[in-house]
From Swiss-Prot:
Gene Ontology BP annotations: translation
Protein name as it appears in the record: Large ribosomal subunit protein bL35
Pfam families according to UniProt: Ribosomal_L35p (PF01632)
Key words of the record: Ribonucleoprotein, Ribosomal protein
Taxonomic classification: Bacteria, Bacillati, Actinomycetota, Actinomycetes, Kitasatosporales
Family, per entry: Belongs to the bacterial ribosomal protein bL35 family.
Signal peptide positions (record): none
Amino acid sequence: MPKNKSHSGASKRFKVTGSGKVLRERAGKRHLLEHKSSRLTRRLTGNAEMAPGDAKKIKKLLGK
């Protein structure tokens, strides 16, 4: 039987760490930043950890 393909959209958006946590980018920092406060844009930097329930679904999409 052939291997299952991982979900290409999910593989672009999420990353699974060595310990099994799923990381995601925070929403709202792509464009239209001019009216957003510096405090908000700083807060949106870096990766966030997925909630356990959502992480389970994402791992299934990624085949992990």
